[in-house]
Structures are given as C-alpha cells and as structure tokens.
Amino acid sequence: MANYDYIKKRIDRLGQERGTWEVNWQEILDYVMPRKADVVTLRTRGEKRTEVLFDSTAITANNLLAASLQGTLTSPSLPWFSIKLRDEELNENRDVQLWLEDTARRMYDTFNETNFNTEVHEMYLDLCSIGTAALFVEEGNKGFDTDGIHFNCLHIAEYYIQESINGKVDTLYRKYKLTARQAVQEFGFDNVGEKVQTASKEKPDHKFNF
C-alpha cells in the first residue's frame, strides 16, 4: 500500500501537470456554470459569481444539452440497461432470464431511490462544459443514509486523474474538505487524527483537508 509521502508527491506532480487546464476550466465555468467556478478563483459562499456574464445563453445551452443526454442515456422513467451473462446458452434459460430481469429491476429501483438522478445530471453538466467528470459511488454513510448507496459528482478542482498506457483512466486522487463533525461521521472517531477528534468536540464545524 502506498504511504502518505508517496501519495502526496504524486498528487503534487499531477497538480503541476494540470495547471494549464485549470485556467481553461475556470474561464469555461465562469460563463457556463458559475456556481461551480471555484478552480483558480476561490469565492466564499454567497459571493456574487455572475459579474462576467452578458446573458444566460451559455448556461441555458449547457443545461439543455445535459438534460437531453440524461433523458436519452440514463432516463429516470425509462429502462436504459439490461443484464445478460457471457454464456449465451445460459441466457436462453427461462429461470436465468427471470433472475436477470429481477436483478435489473432491483438496480433500477435502487437508482431511483437514491440521489443517482441528481448527481448524474451534475455529471452531464460537467461533461458538456469542461469535458471531464467523475461520478463517485459508495456505501450509504454509516447509519446516516438509508438508501444503501450514495452518489457524488466530484468537483473538478477536487480530483486528479492519470491514464494507463492504453489511454484509460486508472488513477484518481481526491483532495477535499470536511468539517470535524463530517469527518467523524465518514471515518469514525477512532479513525481520525487527534486534531480532528478534539475539534469534533470543541469546534465541530472547523474544516480539515483530506
């Protein structure tokens, strides 16, 4: 398992390599998705973000394209995938067909009961604007969610990616902030550092980098 120093150095190197992209992303988001325009220019919550806009043409166009892609590719109201086995002979078995249909139905139900549709829409907005998106899925958060799984479209400023020799993304590092309270909820009290433990009792809203 890679240690902290190795991971830190690799993230720093990836951050240097993507520096020129960050300027482009910031400019695009300023005009197309200002609510996410926190790549190079960091703003506080509630601060005005539309000072460079002439009108909402770019924002509207991005929303329409993202909605069209979602409705076509991952519609919340229409089936958009089915399941089959590699063995075609088994696929002809009626019992196997019924099992696969039931499994697909359970998956659809799970998607529609969670925040999948909200977060996948954010993913399409990112793809249509800056051309890169990361949809993260994990187990529901330790007693705080009842959905079983939880989705999160990561902000472009949070993560660093690298491709394999075949051009496929095989590495993703993420840097993000959590309050002390959120960190304890996410990792458990015994799994966070002493500073976070202390802050969770005295200053639960104080933020830490992870």
Language-model-detected regions and their locations in the chain:
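Extended, helix-rich architectural segments
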Residues: 1-209
